């Protein structure tokens, strides 16, 4: 049974933080794809992350990775899969690892990666779950602020933050800015007026 998933969305929506959290929960291996990454590079990193000394030849590396993953199955997360889209051999290596070991593989990418991956029919057919990260709504922003901020925000101030940004990375920066501002000015709460004066 295929066990591949795809998570994608625009930058700044919290994909990386979500997969790092998920990787810790699942004891998963993370491979962060890079421009020009080859099958050998992928396998060498994977084998190293599995605690083995990588062999030289790609075929030996592949067998080494498969043996280790069969012995101790661990989910693999491939972040920045976009970098591998035009590398058929790299895509096939990931597919073959999945097929040989049966381990779950989660692919993480940007905006239209689902459409780009769909051109690899035999690969894309193995993806059983697809989740798209979308910008946050007001309630999401409120939850993030209330969870992460050391200083409370009025709902009207949260609305100002929401209008300014609904992407995770930017919201975290705004929270840090207001925490520092509150500490410096001894604010007990972030009001709409404070939020507007700093963000608008």
Identify the meaning behind each predicted range:
Residues 1-2, 69:
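Phosphate-binding P-loop
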Residues 55-73:
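Conserved alpha-helical scaffold flanking the Walker A/P-loop in AAA+ ATPase domains
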Residues 12-20, 122, 139-200:
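C-terminal alpha-helical "lid" subdomain
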Residues 5-28:
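P-loop NTPase Walker A phosphate-binding motif
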Residues 68-90, 109:
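Conserved P-loop NTPase "ATPase switch" module shared by AAA+ and STAND
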Residues 95-105, 110:
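Substrate-engagement module of ASCE P-loop NTPases
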Residues 27-30, 39-56:
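Conserved NTP-binding/hydrolysis module of P-loop NTPases
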Residues 113-128:
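Short regulatory helix/loop adjacent to the ATP-binding pocket of P-loop NTPases
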């Amino acid at each position: 049974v295929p066990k591949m998933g795809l998570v994608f969305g625009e930058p700044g929506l919290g994909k990386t933080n979500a997969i790092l959290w998920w990787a810790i929960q699942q004891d998963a291996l993370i491979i962060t794809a890079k421009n020009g990454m080859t099958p050998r590079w992928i396998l060498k990193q994977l084998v190293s992350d599995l605690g083995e000394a990588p062999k030289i030849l790609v075929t030996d590396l592949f067998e080494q990775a498969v043996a280790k993953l069969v012995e101790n199955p661990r989910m693999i997360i491939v972040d920045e899969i976009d970098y591998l889209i035009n590398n058929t051999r790299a895509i096939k290596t990931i597919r073959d690892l999945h097929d040989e070991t049966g381990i779950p593989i989660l692919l993480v990418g940007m905006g239209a990666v689902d459409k780009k991956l769909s051109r690899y029919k035999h690969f894309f057919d193995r993806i059983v779950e697809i989740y798209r990260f979308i910008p946050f709504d007001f309630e999401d922003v409120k939850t993030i602020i209330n969870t992460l901020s050391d200083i409370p925000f009025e709902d009207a101030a949260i609305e100002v933050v929401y209008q300014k940004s609904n992407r995770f990375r930017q919201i975290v920066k705004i929270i840090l800015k207001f925490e520092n501002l509150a500490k410096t000015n001894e604010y007990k709460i972030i009001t709409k007026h404070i939020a507007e004066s700093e963000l608008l």
